Amino acid sequence: MGLNENQRYAIEKYYYEMYYALLAYAKSALNERSLAEEAVQDTFRIACAKADDFLSSSNPNGWLLNTLKNVIHNMIRSR
């Protein structure tokens, strides 16, 4: 099942608000822009897949950052 219109709008809002901050964090952890971009995109893919959990979180920005940290950890571990 896909996102409803309200979920899509809310996630887009977080994308535009948080993308560059998340990218900066990922670049500092991964030392490569293309990998950092991939990590941030994976983070938002997960946010879309878990939209109910993400959007009902008491701290959506923190949810995104924690998800990004997990994505980065998995990327580093799989190298």
Regions found by a protein language model. Name each.
Residues 1-24, 28:
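A short, charge-rich alpha-helical start-of-domain segment used by transcription regulators
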Residues 38-45, 58-70:
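Structural recognition of an alpha-helix C-terminal capping motif at a helix-to-coil junction
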Residues 55, 66-79:
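Arg/Lys-rich amphipathic alpha helix in sigma70-family domain 2
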